[in-house]
């Protein structure tokens, strides 16, 4: 029997007033997280802004559009001053290097195409920062990600953003149920980024017209190879460009300069047929090229699976879901066959081109917006 004086639930799901609810907001210095902080402060919540200094490296520090570079820390602090809540900067450079940058470099050296933004969310923002938020006695942590947290029959669920063009679910598949219980995503229901900027203007935020961040924060101008060479001197060892039929077509200056599916910039012009990178043989220092049809893949082994379904992953022999194998591609119908709690074979109904080890394979409800988790692609067949 409910008591007459039972406290109403606030907008973040807590049975107490906003003033009694402490929220740590992860602030990158961009418009999205700034709007989240301003919105929650305006609603009367006890907001604490936290910005992570992740990377401080020459051009990357001053690079326009690099997440949590020097200018972004300044912008986050300024928003906190404008809206009247405390703001802290935490030095996470060593954690970020160990958990994200080193693996990024090693993955490229192994011939993979990594997605460091997922690892950053998984190992830094939603792990260490979340624990810091709890140390600050926060009730929850809010971010500016475009994704939705909805309450289901068995607890909180992860759902795609209302705006499909801004949806960041691919990059957040590794969010665990325990983390999801503590996280909040106030922007996930908005119809567009324009709505976010309108809110920023209404709050008078200095970042209202700030451009969106681009590329990977520690990779100035998208030049992956130069960053890897700095991190791993001697990584760019020359080798041969070889056709899948065995013909040697030319030389290259390092496997790190190539990715699966690449067509341009191969340095083997003058051929009658268009050729694509179909395999990177790191041991032999070879870049294997072939016709486009060689990129087509239907079977995708996946490991390090984070499962967000209600029933155990291995409770079924098959799961009929949709999957994304690249962030920019639409979900494809697939059958997921569990091998263990953290490993599976994914069979696509139709072949997909350019699937690369190191990318994520994210599981979606084929008839709705729910995300069922995902894992990491480690090879294609």
From Swiss-Prot:
Catalytic activity: S-sulfanyl-L-cysteinyl-[protein] + uridine(34) in tRNA + AH2 + ATP = 2-thiouridine(34) in tRNA + L-cysteinyl-[protein] + A + AMP + diphosphate + H(+)
Disulphide-bridged cysteine pairs: 120-217
PANTHER family, per database record: MITOCHONDRIAL TRNA-SPECIFIC 2-THIOURIDYLASE 1 (PTHR11933:SF5), TRNA 5-METHYLAMINOMETHYL-2-THIOURIDYLATE -METHYLTRANSFERASE (PTHR11933)
Listed GO biological process terms: tRNA wobble position uridine thiolation
Annotated site (Interaction with tRNA): 145, 359
Function: Catalyzes the 2-thiolation of uridine at the wobble position (U34) of tRNA, leading to the formation of s(2)U34.
SUPFAM superfamilies listed in its UniProt record: Adenine nucleotide alpha hydrolases-like
EC number, UniProt record: 2.8.1.13
Region entry Interaction with tRNA, spans: 166-168
Location of the protein in the cell: Cytoplasm
Annotated GO CC locations: cytoplasm
The protein's name in its UniProt record: tRNA-specific 2-thiouridylase MnmA
Residues that bind ATP: 26-33, 52, 144
UniProt similarity note: Belongs to the MnmA/TRMU family.
């Amino acid at each position: 029997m409910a008591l007459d004086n039972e406290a109403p639930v606030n907008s973040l799901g807590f049975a107490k007033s906003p003033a009694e609810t402490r929220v740590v907001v992860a602030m990158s210095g961009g418009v999205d997280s700034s709007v989240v902080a301003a919105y929650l402060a305006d609603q009367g919540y006890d907001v604490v802004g936290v910005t992570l200094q992740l990377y401080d490296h020459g051009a990357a520090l001053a690079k326009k559009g690099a997440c949590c570079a020097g200018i972004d820390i300044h912008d986050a602090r300024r928003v906190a001053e404008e809206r009247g809540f405390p703001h802290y900067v935490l030095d996470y450079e060593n954690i970020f290097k160990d958990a994200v940058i080193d693996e990024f470099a090693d993955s490229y050296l192994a011939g993979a195409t990594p997605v460091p933004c997922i690892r950053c969310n998984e190992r830094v923002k939603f792990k260490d920062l979340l624990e810091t938020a709890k140390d600050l006695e926060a009730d929850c942590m809010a971010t500016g990600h475009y994704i939705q947290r909805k309450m289901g029959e068995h607890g909180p669920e992860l759902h795609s953003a209302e705006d499909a063009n801004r949806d960041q679910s691919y990059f957040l598949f590794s969010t665990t149920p325990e983390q999801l219980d503590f996280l909040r995503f106030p922007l996930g229901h908005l119809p567009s980024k324009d709505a976010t900027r309108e809110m920023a203007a209404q709050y008078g935020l200095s970042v209202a017209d700030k451009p969106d961040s681009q590329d990977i924060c520690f990779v100035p101008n998208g030049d992956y190879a130069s960053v890897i060479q700095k991190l791993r001197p001697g990584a760019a060892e020359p080798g041969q460009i070889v056709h899948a039929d065995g013909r040697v077509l030319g030389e290259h200056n390092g496997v790190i300069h190539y990715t699966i599916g690449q067509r341009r910039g191969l340095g083997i012009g003058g051929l009658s047929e268009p050729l694509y990178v179909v395999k990177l043989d790191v041991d032999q220092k070879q870049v294997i090229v072939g016709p486009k049809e060689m990129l087509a893949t239907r079977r995708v082994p996946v490991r390090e699976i984070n499962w967000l379904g209600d029933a155990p992953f291995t409770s079924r022999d098959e799961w009929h879901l949709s999957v994304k194998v690249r962030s920019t591609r639409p979900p494809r119908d697939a059958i997921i066959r569990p091998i263990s709690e953290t490993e599976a074979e994914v069979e696509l109904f139709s072949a997909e081109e350019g699937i690369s080890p190191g990318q994520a394979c994210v599981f979606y409800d084929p008839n709705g917006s729910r995300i069922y988790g995902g894992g990491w692609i480690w090879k294609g067949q």
